[in-house]
Amino acid sequence: MTSVWKTKVLTGLNKLFDKDGKKAAAAEFLKSFNKEEIGKEIDDKKTELEPKVVEVVESSPPEIKALLKDKKTASKIKKNGPAVTKFLEELAKIDFPGAKPVSDAVAKSGTTPLSPAIAFILEKVAPFVPKEEPKPEPEAEAAAETTSREVAVEEEKKEEEAAPAEPAAAAAEAAAPSTEVVEEKKEEEKPAEAAAPAAEPEKQ
């Protein structure tokens, strides 16, 4: 009976009190967490912090990058608890204002009861994240390729139509002199025909 008390009942009570203790500690921390002061300090050190924060963000896992872009809700922070805890530790290393006390509090109470403070830090980190250039949509790329192909085909057709026209022009030029020769021969034959009738009356 004693062993059952120690292993089940006492352990359950300890967990209950421990959980309540963490909540109480988190509540006390949130009361003393001065957002205005931390926000002002971040603004003052913005130029100094930017390259350090960018480096930390770039080396962070995808879930943190997604969390920085989306709304920092308590459920999302809880879902990504281990990654958030690690990220806060990295921010504390570069002396990001507010990160160190929040990181220490998370180590004692967990991420869930401290989600308001964590969300505040993440919101302050978000503006430092470099914006990604929008990638062109696949449909737009396909349309551009189709258009370029159609233009190329049309140009090829025009070249093919223009090519036969040149030999035809050359043939016409070659035929022109022969036509002139025929006309000259006809003109020479006409005087001969006219002279023949004139000679006939002399014979009579």
Curated annotation (Swiss-Prot):
InterPro entries (alphabetical): DREPP (IPR008469)
Induction: Up-regulated under salt stress.
GO terms under cellular component: plasma membrane
Pfam families per UniProt: DREPP
Top-level taxon of origin: Eukaryota
Biased composition (Basic and acidic residues): 147-161, 182-192
Disordered: region residues: 128-204
UniProt feature, compositional bias: Low complexity: 164-180, 193-204
Family label: Belongs to the DREPP family.
Protein name: Salt stress root protein RS1
